[in-house]
């Protein structure tokens, strides 16, 4: 895990978006949670990497023999365990683990899931049973591209190769078979500019989390009010303030 990413996400104790008012429309059939359900059996063991506060696991993952959710942020895991108690769900646990320094058993899990987080396919391959699946959903380079271009910065803004291709090639190099890469197109509409601003404060859309050189310190650049207002003015529709999202899905078999 890059130091900048660790510091950024460690500051967030709340990964819920319930307070942000928006609607979304998917333009691709592939749905991350549906793929997980499709491959889950009653005796399946699932490892969810980058689980954050566990909301997705608790609300959308199917019942099975065992689910472990991990995150490198202690604050996130504290909230996840609190959410677990309130949910009443069984056979689920949460603990701290760095995705790039996995300490899970070899050949143990039937499915490893990862949503919007850094992964190491070689370590995932080791912890999966033969025939097990990696199911991944990520944020691609062209996500919110018109917004990033207006601010001339943002997550993956200067990357030469899209992260979707990086992850796809990494899965192949790790030894996975039947690796499939699916582009995911979504348009979101935010009810007010305050809702959009709340999103930009919470997630690193406009932040460059590229690792810095030794002794350099990463500081978050404040959102320029004039550029933000310009984007809102140019993208306000009857449905709300438009934000074009670009994600990707990967499913691979060991």
Q: Where do the model's predicted regions map?
A:
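Short, glycine-/aromatic-enriched active-site segment of Class I SAM-dependent methyltransferases
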Residues: 140-159
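A short SAM/SAH-binding and catalytic strip from SAM-dependent methyltransferases
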Residues: 110-122
């Amino acid at each position: 895990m890059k130091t900048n990413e660790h510091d950024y996400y460690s500051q967030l104790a709340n990964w819920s978006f319930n307070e942000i008012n928006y609607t979304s429309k998917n333009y691709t059939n592939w749905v991350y949670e549906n793929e997980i359900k499709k491959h889950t059996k009653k005796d399946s063991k699932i490892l969810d990497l980058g689980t954050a506060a566990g909301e997705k696991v608790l609300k959308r993952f199917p019942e099975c023999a065992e689910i472990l959710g991990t995150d490198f942020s202690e604050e996130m895991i504290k909230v996840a365990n609190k959410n677990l108690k309130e949910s009443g769900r069984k056979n689920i646990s949460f603990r701290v683990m760095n995705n790039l320094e996995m300490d899970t058993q070899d050949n143990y899990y039937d499915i490893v899931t990862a949503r919007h987080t850094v992964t190491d396919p070689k370590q995932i391959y080791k912890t999966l049973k033969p025939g097990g699946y990696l199911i991944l959903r990520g944020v691609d380079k062209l996500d919110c591209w018109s917004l990033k271009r207006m601010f001339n910065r943002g997550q993956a803004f200067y990357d030469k190769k899209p992260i979707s291709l990086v992850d796809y090639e990494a899965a192949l190099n790790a030894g996975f078979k039947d690796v499939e890469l699916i582009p995911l197109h979504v348009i979101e509409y935010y009810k007010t500019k305050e809702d959009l601003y709340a999103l930009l404060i919470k997630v690193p859309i406009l932040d460059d989390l590229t690792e810095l050189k030794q002794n350099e310190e990463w500081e978050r650049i404040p959102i320029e009010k004039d550029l933000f207002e310009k984007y809102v003015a140019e993208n306000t529709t009857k449905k709300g303030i438009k934000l074009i999202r670009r994600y990707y899905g990967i499913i691979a078999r060991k």
